[in-house]
Amino acid sequence: MEKFHAQYEMLETIGQGGCAQVKLARHRLTGTHVAVKVIVKRECWFNPVMSEAELLMMTDHPNIISLLQVIETKKKVYLIMELCEGKSLYQHIQNAGYLQEDEARPLFKQLLSAMNYCHNQGIVHRDLTPDNIMVEKDGKVKIIDFGLGTQEKPGQNHNLFCEIYPFSTPEVLFNRPYDMRKIDVWGLGVVLYFMVTGKILFDTASVEKLRKQIVAEKCSVPCRLSVELQDLIRLLMTDIPELRPTVAEVMVHPWVTEGSGVLPDPCEEHIPLKPDPAIAKAMGFIGFQAQDIEDSLCQRKFNETMASYCLLKKQILKECDRPIRAQPMNPSVTPLSSLVDAPTFHLGLRRTETEPTGLRLSDNKEVPVCGNSTSKKRERSFSGPGVLSRPINTTPTMDQTHTRTWSGPCIYSNVCTIHPNSINESTEGHISTSAEDKPVHSRGWPRGIKGWTRKIGNAMRKLCCCIPSKETSHLGQRRVCPKI
C-alpha cells in the first residue's frame, strides 16, 4: 500500500466491476494522470486477476489499452494503465444517436486491427461490449478490460459460462462447447450493429427471453443500411459458430475495404525497447540509473522505472503539441534572442561553435548571442540527437499575441531574457555583457516528493524546448533586452 501511494496520488473512482474498481490517479513524479485498476485478492480468484495482467503484458498495439506498471501487495493488485481521454463507445453512440456508415467504418477498422492482433497472439477478449471500448477525442479507439480474457490454442473448445447476457452468443446460452475466437467475432457484430443503429440487438437480462429472441428473430438488420453492411452484420452474428468468419476474413470484406482508410499498424511501438538518450539523461538527474532504464524497457518489467519513462515521454509529447503564447512586441524593434550558455544548461549538454550545424532559425537571419564580450553578430547552431521537432512561424505584432515555435532538435535550445537597462547605446547596435558577469551554478535539488516533482518538471520543460524553467539557475547573471 505504501509503495503505491508513494508513487501515485489516488483521486476518484471512474469505474466499478465485480471485484475491482478503476480509479483516476496522478503520477507524483510527472503529474500525469493514469487509470488504476484496483483488484482485491480476497474478493475474487487470484489466477484470473494475474491473467489479466499477464495478457496486457503481452500486448503492444495502438488500439489496446497500455499497461504501464503492476504493483502487488498482500491484499491488492494495482494495474497502472494509460488514461483514455474520451468516452466509452456506449456514451459516444448515446450522444450521437447512431453513426453513419462512413463514420462507423474507421472505428470498426481499428477494432478489427486490435482483435486480429490479439488472436494472432493467442489472446481472446470474450467481453467485447460498447462499455469496454473507448473512443478518444481524436477518434482513436482503445479496447479495455481484459478481465474475462484468456489465452487459447487454435481449435480448443470451452464450456465456461462467463459472458454478460445481452452480448452472449447462442452457443454459450445453450451450454454448448464453443470456440473462444468465434465469441469475439460475435461481439464485433453486436458492436457494429450498435454503432449503426444505436440499439442493442438482443436487449434483455433474462436468459430464457434471450434464447427465445435469438431463435425467433435471428438477426433483423434495418433495410436502410447498405447491402454490403447488411451482409457483414449477418455474417458476424450467424448463430452457427462454424459459419462465422475469422477476424482476418472480416478485414477483407467489401464493406470494410471500401474507401481509402488504412488499418492501424500493429507494429507501432508504444513501449520502446531502447530509451531515448535525452529522456534517459533527464531521468538520470532525478536518480534513475541508465542501465536500469534500458533493462526495464528492453525486458518490459512493468516497474516504477518503466512507468516513469513512458509517462515522462507522453508528457513531453503532449507539451510540445501545445502552441506557445508569446508576449506582444514592438514591430519597430527586432527581438534579440540567444541560446543560453552551456555551463548554465541543466541537462549538461555542451556544444561549441565549431561543431556541425544542426539547428538554425528558419528566417536565416543572424542572431546576437548573449555571453562573453563581442563586437560582431554571430549565428550559433547546435547539433545532436533531436527527439522532438516543431515548425517555426513568427510574426511580431503590436498589442497582439502570436504563436512562436522552434525548428530542429529543440531539446538543446533555450532563450535568455534581455532587459533594457543594460543596452550599450554608444555601440553600433551591438550588445555585449561584462566579462565579470559569470553564471552561478544551480543550487542543489530540493528534497522530498515535491522536490522530485519540480525537478522532473524542469527537465520536461527543457525537453519541450520553449517552456521556461521555474527554477532560477542564473543568479547573479545580468540580462539585457531591447529598449522600446
Curated annotation (Swiss-Prot):
Residues 355-400, 426-446 are annotated as: Disordered. It catalyses: L-seryl-[protein] + ATP = O-phospho-L-seryl-[protein] + ADP + H(+); L-threonyl-[protein] + ATP = O-phospho-L-threonyl-[protein] + ADP + H(+). Keywords: ATP-binding, Kinase, Nucleotide-binding, Serine/threonine-protein kinase, Transferase, Tyrosine-protein kinase. Its EC number is 2.7.11.1. Belongs to the protein kinase superfamily. Tyr protein kinase family. Smok subfamily. The gene is Smoktcr. It comes from the Eukaryota. The active site is at residue 127. InterPro entries: Kinase-like_dom_sf, Prot_kinase_dom, Tyr_kinase_AS. ATP binds at residues 14-22, 37. It is an enzyme of class 2 (transferase). Testis-specific. Expressed in the testis from 22 days postpartum (22 dpp). Expressed late in spermiogenesis, only in Tcr-containing t-haplotypes. GO terms for molecular function: ATP binding; protein serine kinase activity; protein serine/threonine kinase activity; protein tyrosine kinase activity. Encoded on the T-complex, a region of 20-30 Mb on proximal third of mouse chromosome 17. Naturally occurring variant forms of the T-complex, known as complete t-haplotypes, are found in wild mouse populations. The t-haplotypes contain at least four nonoverlapping inversions that suppress recombination with the wild-type chromosome, and lock into strong linkage disequilibrium loci affecting normal transmission of the chromosome, male gametogenesis and embryonic development. T6 allele. Pfam families: Pkinase. This is Sperm motility kinase Tcr mutant form. The keyword Transmembrane does not apply. While the main function of Smoks is to control sperm motility, the role of Smok-Tcr, with reduced kinase activity, is to counterbalance a signaling impairment caused by the distorter/sterility loci, giving t-sperm an advantage in reaching the oocytes. Transmission ratio distortion also called segregation distortion is the name given to the phenomenon above-mentioned. Being associated with the T-complex, it allows males heterozygous for a complete t-haplotype to preferentially transmit the t-haplotype chromosome. Residues 8-256 form the Protein kinase domain. Residues 391-400 have a biased composition (Polar residues).
